[in-house]
């Protein structure tokens, strides 16, 4: 019989190894299912042998019970801020000061991307993670140990000869995780986070560690200390050691032998910053030698041996000269500010979104006001706030009729957007075609704004289905269209006929039906015809389809013009059927589960994956077709409904037993 302590330790070693490969090196060696199997075997053993549970176990990453507040902790040595260099001249001044203070001695720099997140120190004893503290005021921070434990790229144990040490680094949220988080908050009716930095800071300081665990934070290290002092004689050596110990270190960091090399590094990443998976706001430049750092010393607030080269601000102040209204593919009217041109983050900006009428009212904004404009990535710039009211300000009023087709606009109760309800509005048609042809939908390369404008304005295309009737000669007389480019567009249109039913559903532009919902509808019904005939109640049996989505689908197919459009697309040989079969033979085949509350060890997503891998189905709402409700702490109305419908309620432990076929 196996010694459980030995098996537990072996499982922990395996899981730590695979977490490092996946979350730090991005080089996984096993599948998610294999990782889950190891994790759940460890959870099973720790449940049976609670005396063997330790804080550094991978199972403890999911987060513990909510806290009442954060304890203040004094840092082993101050986490100082850095002086800033805002241009090349200031960076060269820094270099001159360093050379003067070092008396002409040879030295080199290390350059690191300045990641835009929340600074945090993590402490280890005998290779095991023990404590995490935010930067705070630089002298004292907040104990966020339980929240930090949920960050997968922060190792809970490392192999090292150092008996006790501290790492310092930046807690960040990737652009992708940020977009997912805001999309999720939109669906729940919650306010959006302004930027990834705010999202990372708010996530790390959650009173409920399980919320932090769901936010996909990452931790990049840049300092290694023992007893509050650098552990190695060069900064580059310390970064190398951190990598070898299993910490995530930004792989863009470089040693530089001169200030010209430093400036070249800064210029390169300023041009590439929008292509990075995370946000940066500059470059940190450090003298590499720790001995030379000591000689250079500190000012009252910052080290003399390091500086932050800040990229141009992505906020600027300018004046609103007017407000236009744009019409989207769903008919939503969006007010857009016409700005006095201003450079924001190196790009000249003359327009910025105002989102909707409520946002204008919230900002207290009028034409003629001075406003702060922010630009982030490829997203259209937005107005953040009014900085000063104009002397001759003029209030904006949303038009009562569509600015393109003059149809009376409608604003439904509970909605922020006003809408043009004319399905034949030229502006709506243009946006619908662009959506239909976009990457990730029907992916018709070459179908851009300029071509779509001409197709609609010259009345060559009256609806989406007309695209499949186009011939090369229809495009030949259009601006910037030759035989070759016209042929490419026609070939790409033809190739799009092979796209799957979920893509076709997404392309139709039905309200609330995005890529994910389209997949669930295709899986549940198998064909466009079945979806078109389905009732609101029947549609809600599909995974993650609630009343709002179901009603939108039924409403779409109730409109004769939409049914005619779908019929024409069917005749154009688009894919209207979908072959999908759920995993068969699993222990949960035929059962539908609903998850509610906070589970002890599994996140919602982890539980969902396990159920589906075992052949089961996870629904978002409790109904008569629900087989089991898996309830954790703080279960809400779903638990009450389960009791009302006499549906069996089970714990996470019972779910694990069912997964094992018991």
Swiss-Prot record:
Binding, Zn(2+): 402, 405, 420, 425
Gene Ontology molecular functions: DNA binding; DNA ligase (NAD+) activity; metal ion binding
This enzyme's EC code(s): 6.5.1.2
Catalytic activity: NAD(+) + (deoxyribonucleotide)n-3'-hydroxyl + 5'-phospho-(deoxyribonucleotide)m = (deoxyribonucleotide)n+m + AMP + beta-nicotinamide D-nucleotide
Positions that bind NAD(+): 32-36, 81-82, 112, 135, 170, 286, 310
Keyword Ligase: yes
GO biological process, one term: DNA repair
Active site: 114 (n6-amp-lysine intermediate)
UniProt keywords, alphabetically: DNA damage, DNA repair, DNA replication, Ligase, Magnesium, Manganese, Metal-binding, NAD, Zinc
InterPro entries referenced in this protein's UniProt entry, alphabetically: BRCT_dom, BRCT_dom_sf, DisA/LigA_HHH, DNA_ligase, DNA_ligase_AS, DNA_ligase_CS, DNAligase_adenylation, DNAligase_N
Domain BRCT: 583-662
Disulfide bonds: none
Pfam family, one: BRCT
Cofactor: Mg(2+); Mn(2+)
Superkingdom of origin organism: Bacteria
Family: Belongs to the NAD-dependent DNA ligase family. LigA subfamily.
Stored NCBIfam families: dnlj, PRK07956.1
Function of the molecule: DNA ligase that catalyzes the formation of phosphodiester linkages between 5'-phosphoryl and 3'-hydroxyl groups in double-stranded DNA using NAD as a coenzyme and as the energy source for the reaction. It is essential for DNA replication and repair of damaged DNA.
Name under which the protein is recorded: DNA ligase
Native source organism of the sequence: Solibacter usitatus (strain Ellin6076)
Gene name linked to the record: ligA
């Amino acid at each position: 019989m196996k010694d459980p302590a030995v098996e537990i330790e072996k499982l922990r070693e395996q899981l730590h190894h695979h977490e490092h490969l996946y979350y730090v090196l991005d080089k996984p060696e096993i599948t998610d299912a294999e990782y889950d199997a190891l994790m759940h075997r460890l959870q099973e053993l720790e449940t049976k042998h609670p005396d063997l549970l330790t804080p550094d176990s991978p199972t403890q990453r999911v987060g513990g019970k909510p806290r009442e507040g954060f304890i203040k902790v004094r840092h082993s040595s101050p986490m100082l801020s850095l002086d800033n260099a805002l241009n090349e001249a200031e960076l060269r001044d820094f270099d001159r000061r360093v050379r003067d203070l070092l008396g002409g001695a040879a030295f080199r720099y290390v350059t690191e991307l300045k990641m835009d997140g929340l600074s945090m120190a993590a402490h280890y004893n005998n290779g095991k993670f023990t404590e995490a503290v935010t930067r705070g005021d630089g002298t004292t921070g907040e104990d966020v140990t339980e929240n930090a434990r949920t960050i997968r790229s922060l190792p809970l144990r490392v192999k090292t000869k150092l008996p006790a040490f501290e790492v310092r680094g930046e807690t960040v949220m990737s652009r992708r995780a940020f977009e997912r988080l805001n999309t999720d908050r939109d669906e729940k009716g919650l306010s959006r986070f302004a930027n990834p930095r705010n999202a990372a800071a708010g996530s790390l300081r959650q009173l409920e560690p399980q919320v932090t665990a769901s936010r996909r934070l990452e931790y990049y290290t840049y300092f290694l200390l023992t007893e509050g002092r650098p552990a190695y004689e060069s900064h580059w050596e310390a970064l190398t050691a951190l990598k070898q110990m299993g910490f995530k270190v930004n792989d863009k960091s470089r040693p530089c032998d001169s200030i010209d090399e430093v400036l070249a590094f800064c210029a390169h990443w300023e041009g590439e910053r929008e292509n990075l998976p995370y946000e940066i706001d500059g470059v940190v430049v450090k003298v590499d030698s720790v001995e030379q750092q000591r000689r250079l010393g500190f000012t009252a607030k910052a080290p003399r041996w390091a500086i932050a080269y800040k990229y141009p601000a992505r906020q600027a102040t300018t004046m609103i000269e007017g407000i236009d209204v744009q019409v989207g593919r769903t008919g939503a009217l969006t007010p857009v500010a016409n700005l006095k041109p201003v450079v924001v983050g190196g790009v000249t900006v003359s327009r910025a979104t105002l989102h909707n009428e409520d946002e204008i009212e919230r900002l207290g904004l009028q034409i003629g006001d001075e406003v702060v404009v922010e630009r982030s990535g490829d997203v259209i710039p937005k107005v953040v706030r009014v900085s000063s009211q104009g002397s001759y300000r003029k209030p904006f009023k949303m038009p009562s009729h569509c600015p393109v087709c003059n149809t009376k606009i409608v604003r439904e109760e509970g909605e922020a957007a006003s809408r043009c309800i004319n399905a034949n509005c030229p502006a709506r048609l243009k946006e619908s075609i662009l959506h239909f042809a976009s990457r990730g939908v029907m992916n018709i390369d070459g179908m851009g704004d300029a071509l779509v404008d001409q197709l609609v304005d010259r009345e060559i295309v009256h609806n989406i289905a007309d695209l499949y009737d186009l011939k090369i000669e229809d495009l030949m007389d259009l601006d910037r269209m030759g035989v070759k480019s016209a042929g490419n567009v026609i070939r790409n249109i033809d190739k799009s006929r092979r796209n799957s039913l979920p893509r076709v559903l997404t392309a139709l532009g039905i309200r609330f039906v995005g890529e994910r919902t389209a997949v669930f509808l295709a899986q549940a019904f198998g064909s466009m015809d079945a979806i078109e005939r389905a009732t609101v109640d029947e549609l809600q049996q599909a995974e993650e389809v609630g009343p709002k989505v179901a009603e939108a689908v039924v409403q779409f197919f109730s409109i004769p013009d939409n049914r005619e459009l779908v019929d024409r697309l069917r005749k154009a040989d688009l894919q209207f059927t979908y072959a999908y079969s759920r995993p068969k033979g699993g222990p949960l085949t035929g059962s539908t589960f609903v998850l509610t509350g906070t589970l002890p060890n599994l996140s919602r997503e982890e539980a969902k994956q396990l159920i589906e891998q075992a052949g089961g189905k996870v629904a978002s709402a409790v109904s008569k077709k629900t087989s089991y409700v898996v309830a954790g702490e703080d279960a809400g109305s779903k638990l009450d409904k389960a009791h009302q419908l006499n549906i069996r309620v089970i714990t996470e432990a019972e779910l694990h037993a069912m997964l094992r076929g018991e």
